[in-house]
């Protein structure tokens, strides 16, 4: 064993500042000289429109997997892809990586990108977004937000997360480092929950700049990140007249007076039928008199002469108006008269 290999196998007990920056120890053939005991296989189906592309690139897929001692089969009749281990396979996890590769290829990811998942530091994530939004129109609109105009939003997500992202149908396929996959998943899920992706992109850009400053390594970054308030207003129609809530009282409201209670209070309850009838007639005649009075006033209103101003008040107004003198106009007249006198 060389010195470099001995250093890699050495287990460090020191605290780790950044777990994402840790190097994953490589798994070599010497670590598993006997290979795998049982044959493992994974199969996945692909849609009809991918048949032509997969048929063209399948020799490259077989060549790529044979380097890791894996077998690949393409069944065009059933529309399936199968990967299997062989007797020479020594990496037990490479079959899982190969399964992810054929899954990505079935989701319209090109072979040049899908084969990267076989690397140790590269992973993949297939995010299902079809059941996150109930209405089809909203789903299409929010999925389009994720892509952006001319794919600009998707490109910016790829640059910030170092991941390859593909939006296809009801899924979003992501391929890249594991930290970037977490960020892509957060952005996609929040976008489908009606949070515009530009907000998360801005936050990622700020975080990238803050990571460059070692003084802020142990500080809270929430004060630097933008805070966005939800401005969704309720679409419920508000009533024109809103009822004011009455003050809370622990006692129940008093019982309303009945007709008998009112008659007892006024003394009408103890009158006989003739007296009640006489009282009703009296009330009726009083109402008729008031109505006749109002009608006479309305008729006589046309015959009431208008009020005339007295002669003394009109003279006072004339005197008041005559006492007012326009000083500016008088000055202008005097200056004009002086000019005429000088010229003559």
Curated annotation (Swiss-Prot):
Keywords: Coiled coil, Developmental protein, Nucleus, Ribonucleoprotein, Ribosome biogenesis, RNA-binding, rRNA processing
SMART domains xref list: KH (SM00322)
Domain KH: 125-193
Stretches with biased composition (Basic residues): 232-245
Gene3D superfamilies: K Homology domain, type 1 (3.30.1370.10)
Ranges of Basic and acidic residues composition bias in the record: 283-302, 315-326
Its job: Required for 40S ribosome biogenesis. Involved in nucleolar processing of pre-18S ribosomal RNA and ribosome assembly. Binds to RNA. Required for female germline development, cell viability during eye development and for survival of dividing cells and epithelial cells during early wing disk development.
The name this protein goes by in its record: KRR1 small subunit processome component homolog
Species this protein is from: Drosophila yakuba
């Amino acid at each position: 064993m060389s010195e470099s290999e001995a250093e890699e196998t050495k287990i460090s007990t020191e605290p780790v500042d950044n777990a994402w920056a840790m190097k994953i120890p490589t798994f070599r053939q010497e670590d598993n000289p006997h290979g795998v005991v049982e044959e493992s296989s994974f199969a996945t189906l692909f849609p009809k429109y991918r048949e032509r592309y997969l048929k063209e690139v399948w020799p490259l897929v077989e060549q790529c997997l044979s380097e890791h001692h894996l077998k690949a089969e393409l069944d065009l009749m059933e529309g399936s892809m199968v990967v299997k281990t062989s007797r020479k396979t020594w990496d037990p996890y490479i079959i899982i990586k190969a399964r992810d590769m054929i899954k990505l290829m079935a989701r319209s990811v090109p072979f040049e990108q899908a084969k990267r998942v076989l690397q140790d530091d590269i992973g993949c994530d297939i995010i299902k977004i079809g059941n996150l939004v109930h209405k089809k129109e909203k789903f299409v609109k929010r999925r389009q937000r994720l892509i952006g105009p001319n794919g600009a939003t998707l490109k910016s997500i790829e640059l910030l997360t170092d991941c390859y992202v593909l939006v296809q149908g009801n899924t979003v396929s992501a391929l890249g480092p594991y930290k970037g996959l977490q960020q892509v998943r957060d952005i996609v899920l929040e976008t489908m929950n009606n949070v515009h992706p530009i907000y998360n992109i801005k936050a990622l850009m700020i975080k990238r700049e803050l990571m460059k400053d070692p003084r802020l390594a142990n500080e809270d970054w929430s004060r630097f990140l933008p805070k966005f308030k939800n401005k969704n207003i309720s679409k419920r129609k508000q009533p024109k007249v809103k009822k004011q809530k009455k003050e809370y009282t622990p006692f129940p409201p008093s019982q309303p007076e009945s007709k008998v209670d009112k008659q007892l209070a006024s003394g009408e309850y103890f009158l006989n039928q003739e007296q009640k009838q006489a009282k009703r007639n009296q009330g009726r005649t009083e109402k008729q008199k008031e109505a006749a009075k109002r009608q006479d006033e309305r008729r006589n209103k046309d015959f009431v002469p208008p009020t005339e101003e007295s002669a003394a008040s009109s003279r006072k107004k004339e005197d008041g108006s005559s006492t007012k003198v326009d000083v500016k106009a008088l000055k202008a007249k005097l200056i004009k008269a002086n000019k005429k006198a000088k010229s003559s």
